[in-house]
Design a protein with these regions (language model features):
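N-terminal nucleotide-binding beta1-loop-alpha1 segment
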Residues: 1-19
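Short catalytic helix/loop segments, enriched in acidic residues and glycine
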Residues: 20-35
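Short beta->alpha linker loops
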Residues: 29, 55, 83, 195, ...
Length: 241
């Protein structure tokens, strides 16, 4: 099992915080978002990581060297040299194309209850983490699931018909990787600005996908300053136990 952490984006909605560092290196309590996610993974015996680099890659590489000395982990890097013209479908494609093992895919700005990671890893098949508890809005990356198949995925889905929100954390079973990579190739060819999340819509029609529902376990994705403030609150709660 390896964990891919997507750290290539520019984080424009958090400027000026992200002017000199990418979002995953933003710190709360002297610990970066990326390190906090790695700690969650290490707690579940995931010790191998692939970090996708892009915006301010030198800062991420510097942090990686520090983390490799601090924890018993292995870290590979993949550079998305076209990070400013592409999106997560391209970044994930770069990271997964040579893998032959189960892999988690994690947005680099995720802050989550560690039980989300540990419970996801108990599922042996390809699986997505879906928040079925949070109040949805127009910005939520929603899914509509019927008979275990993703009928729709994206922000434009009717809130009333949505099954929940995809939180940006998933796991691809190694046997599904060839098909997953093929779908990613098609997404990138269609539009390099596509999100990798869209690959699961097609994959769900041809492979068995499980859905881990958060059932109230807390998380956030740090997209803007409101999220950043909420992340501070969450981490305070997590650290207090």
């Amino acid at each position: 099992m390896k964990a891919i952490i997507l750290a290539a984006g520019t984080g424009t909605r958090l400027m000026p915080l992200t002017k000199d560092i990418p979002k995953p290196l933003l710190e709360i309590g002297d610990i970066s978002l990326m390190e906090r996610m790695m700690i969650n993974c290490i707690s579940s015996n995931v010790n191998e990581f692939i970090i996708v680099l892009g915006h301010k890659k030198e800062r991420v590489i510097e942090k990686i060297e520090y983390l490799k000395k601090k924890y018993p982990i292995k870290i590979e890097t993949v550079e998305n040299k076209m990070y400013s013209q592409t999106n997560t479908s391209f970044s994930v494609k770069l990271a997964t194309q040579k893998l032959d093992d189960d892999v988690m895919i994690i947005n680099g700005d995720n802050v989550v209850d560690e039980r989300i990671i540990s419970d996801l890893l108990k599922i042996k098949e390809t699986a997505l983490v879906v928040d079925n508890h949070k109040h949805l809005n127009e910005e939520s990356f929603k899914l509509r699931i019927e008979d275990n198949i993703i009928m729709e995925i994206g922000k434009g889905i009717d809130i009333e018909t949505a099954s929940g929100e995809f939180i940006g954390i998933s796991k691809v079973f190694k046997d599904d990787l060839p098909l997953f990579n093929s779908i990613l190739d098609e997404l990138v060819a269609e539009d390099a600005q596509n999100y990798y999340d869209l690959a699961y819509k097609e994959l769900s029609k041809k492979a068995k996908i499980r859905y881990f529902y958060t059932n109230g376990l807390k998380w956030t994705e740090v997209d803007d300053k409101k999220d950043w403030l909420y992340a501070h609150t969450l981490i305070g709660e997590f650290d207090d136990g």
